[in-house]
From Swiss-Prot:
Disordered, as annotated region: 1-50
Superkingdom of this protein's organism: Bacteria
Name of protein: UPF0283 membrane protein RHECIAT_CH0002430
A GO-annotated cellular component: plasma membrane
Swiss-Prot/TrEMBL keywords: Cell inner membrane, Cell membrane, Membrane, Transmembrane, Transmembrane helix
Location of the protein in the cell: Cell inner membrane
Transmembrane portions of the chain: 77-97, 111-131
Pfam family, one: DUF697
Membrane topology field: Multi-pass membrane protein
Family: Belongs to the UPF0283 family.
């Protein structure tokens, strides 16, 4: 009778040391020997937050210009003095006209009647001019009123006030054919229940999006013209005069685009508001951020100094256009993105931008 096969002898359990575990004490000993001694630091050290660190957030240097707002109208002693002397000069002009007409009547009746006819035509022309300027000022005031009422209507819970603001906005932009599609879309939503914030966002997308695209094209074209003229003009006076001409032309085109259509006095007031905003924010001078934007695209090494001046003047013209856009736009930027200076660098320097280098 054969015996069953016996199991092979089992190896007793043993512990093994891995290479990492074996080297750990040695490495820890080296680390302990290589540690530096604690030191004290000065209390004047300021830690820069991550959101302000230009190496972590390189786009933080491209600071968007602040939103332009119209200046508050205040009564000053200069305005009172100008009004008083204006009334005095008007009385003197009236007395001179009366004496002139009397003298003409003493010479011949037909001369007196002719002078009266000329005076009547002049008075009618002045009245028409006053009416036109007053209408232009009222249109500019209506734009700011709609903007303020829209901001207040967003905070309401009922859409009645937002609907009223939307009706005024539609009336303001009714003469612009580019808003016809948006007006039809908004008219189709009259029977629907929409919250005021969503209603104003819909109005901004449907009515102002095509106008914003055209406004951006106006700013780009004006900036390009200023850049070219600055690069080829022989005198700095020519640069200054042309920049002023393009600024006035751009501000007027921006006001007419958004339904303002200012007159002569309204244009002066709008120009004063834009220049006051640029002077307060320091946008007239070439600041560090603007220089960084230009030099960051390699213009210092790839362009001549004259062409670099043209690009800087073009960027300043773009800032004027952005400020005019803020003042003339009947709704504040909420749903749509507000343009910044960085959006126009690629248009002024296409060969230096990644978009221009792509085939």
């Amino acid at each position: 009778m054969s015996k069953p096969p016996s199991d092979p002898p089992r190896r007793p359990p043993a512990a093994f040391a891995y290479e990492d575990e074996a080297s750990e004490p040695r490495n820890s000993g080296r680390q302990q020997q290589g540690r530096r001694k604690p030191e004290s630091f000065s209390e004047n050290i300021v830690v820069t937050p991550d959101e302000d660190d230009p190496f972590i957030n390189p786009d933080s240097d491209l600071i968007a210009p602040p939103v332009a707002t119209p200046r508050k109208r205040r009564t000053s002693f200069g305005k009172i003095a100008a009004g008083a002397f204006g009334i005095l000069l008007s009385l003197g002009l009236g007395l001179w006209t009366d004496r002139l007409i009397r003298d003409l009547f003493t010479r011949a009746d037909w001369l007196g009647y002719a002078a009266l006819g000329v005076l009547a035509i002049g008075i009618l022309a002045v009245l028409a001019l006053v009416i036109r300027e007053t209408a232009g000022m009222m249109r500019l005031a209506a734009v700011q009123t709609i903007k303020a009422e829209a901001e207040a209507a967003i905070l309401e819970t009922r859409p009645a006030k937002a609907r009223a603001v939307l009706a005024r906005l539609t009336t303001l932009l009714a003469a612009n054919p580019e808003t016809s599609k948006g007006r039809a879309t908004l008219k189709a939503t009259e029977g629907e229940v929409i919250d005021p914030p969503h209603l104003m966002a819909l109005a901004e997308r449907e009515l102002l999006a095509p106008l914003d695209r055209k406004a951006r094209a106006l700013i780009v074209n004006a900036s390009k013209r200023v850049s070219i003229v600055t690069a080829v003009s022989p005198r700095a006076v020519v640069d200054l005069l042309y920049v002023l001409y393009e600024a006035v032309r751009l501000i007027r085109a921006m006001a007419e685009l958004y339904g303002g259509r200012p007159g002569t006095l309204g244009m002066f007031r709008l120009l004063r508001d834009v220049l006051a905003h640029l002077a307060v924010t320091g946008s007239i001078a070439v600041g560090d951020s603007l220089v960084q934007q230009v030099l960051g695209h390699g213009l210092a090494s790839k362009l001549s100094a004259r062409l670099g001046e043209g690009v800087i003047n073009g960027l300043m013209t773009a800032r004027i256009g952005i400020a005019a856009m803020d003042l003339c736009r009947p709704l504040a930027f909420r749903t749509l993105k507000r343009p910044g200076i960085g959006d126009f660098i690629a248009d002024l320097t296409p060969s230096m931008s990644p978009r221009g280098n792509n085939p």
